[in-house]
C-alpha cells in the first residue's frame, strides 16, 4: 500500500459509506447514456478485483468509453483487459526508481519485474496510454527522474503529479509535495529522456 495513497478508506475498506453496489452503479450509468462519454475505472488497484474483466465489459457494452488506472502490479490481468478491446485508454503509475520501489509501495519484497512487464504490455497493446508519477518528499529526489524516465523512453505522455495531502492517507502523515524549484529540476531531468514530459496541471 503506497503510503501516499489518497484513498485510504477504499484501500483499507474501513468506510463503505457513500458507496454504490453494482446494480445501483449500472442503473446510474443507464440514466446517463448520451450525457456521459466514458468511465474511469480506478482504485485502489482495480486489477485486484476478481470480476474486473466482466465489470469493464459491462461498461463498454453500454456504449461508454473506458479508462483504466493501474499500478501495473498484475500484468496478466492487465494483458487480458487490454486484449479484450474494452479499454480505450490506460494510465499507469510509476512509483519510483527500481531500488526504492518496495519502500515506495509499502511492500519490502515487491517484485519490480511485474511493473516492467506491464510497461511492455502497455507499449505493445495498441491502446492509447500515459504514464505518471506522483512526486512525494521524502520518497523522491529530483535526481531520480532521469532514471525513472529510462524505463519508458518511448512514452508519448509522461506526467509528474506533485503530491497533495487529501487528508485521507494510508501513511497518516509525514509526506509533503516537492518544492517548486525541486519539481522543476525533476521535470528537467525527465526531459533528458522524454522531451515532451509535463507537470500535471501545467499542460
Language model features with spans:
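Conserved AdoMet/S-adenosylmethionine-binding subsite of the radical SAM
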Residues: 26-38, 47-182
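Canonical Radical SAM [4Fe-4S] cluster-binding loop centered on the CxxxCxxC motif
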Residues: 1-20
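Hydrophobic alpha-helical segments typical of transmembrane helices
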Residues: 6, 24-25, 77, 186
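Short, charge-patterned binding micro-sites
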Residues: 44
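A C-terminal junction/extension of Radical SAM enzymes
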Residues: 184-203
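N-terminal pre-catalytic segment of deacetylase/amide-hydrolase enzymes
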Residues: 17-24, 30
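Residue-level detector of family-conserved "landmark" positions at structurally sensitive sites
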Residues: 15, 69, 132, 199-202
Amino acid at each position: 500500500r503506497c503510503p501516499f495513497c489518497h484513498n485510504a478508506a477504499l484501500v483499507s475498506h474501513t468506510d463503505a459509506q457513500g458507496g454504490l453496489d453494482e446494480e445501483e452503479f449500472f442503473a446510474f450509468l443507464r440514466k446517463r447514456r448520451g450525457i456521459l462519454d466514458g468511465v474511469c475505472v480506478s482504485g485502489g488497484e482495480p486489477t485486484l478485483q476478481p470480476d474486473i474483466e466482466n465489470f469493464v465489459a459491462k461498461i463498454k457494452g453500454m456504449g461508454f468509453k473506458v479508462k483504466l488506472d493501474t499500478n501495473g502490479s498484475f500484468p496478466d490481468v492487465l494483458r487480458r483487459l487490454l486484449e479484450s478491446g474494452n479499454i480505450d485508454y490506460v494510465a499507469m503509475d510509476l512509483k519510483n526508481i527500481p531500488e526504492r520501489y518496495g519502500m515506495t509501495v509499502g511492500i519490502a519484497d515487491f517484485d519490480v519485474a511485474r511493473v516492467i512487464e506491464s510497461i511492455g504490455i502497455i507499449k505493445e497493446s495498441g491502446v492509447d496510454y500515459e504514464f505518471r508519477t506522483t512526486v512525494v518528499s521524502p520518497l523522491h529526489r529530483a535526481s531520480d527522474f532521469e532514471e525513472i524516465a529510462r524505463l519508458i523512453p518511448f512514452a508519448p505522455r509522461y506526467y509528474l503529479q506533485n503530491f497533495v495531502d487529501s487528508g485521507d492517507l494510508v501513511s497518516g502523515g509525514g509526506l509533503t509535495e516537492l518544492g517548486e524549484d525541486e519539481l522543476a529540476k525533476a521535470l528537467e531531468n525527465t526531459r533528458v529522456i522524454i522531451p515532451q514530459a509535463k507537470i500535471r496541471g501545467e499542460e
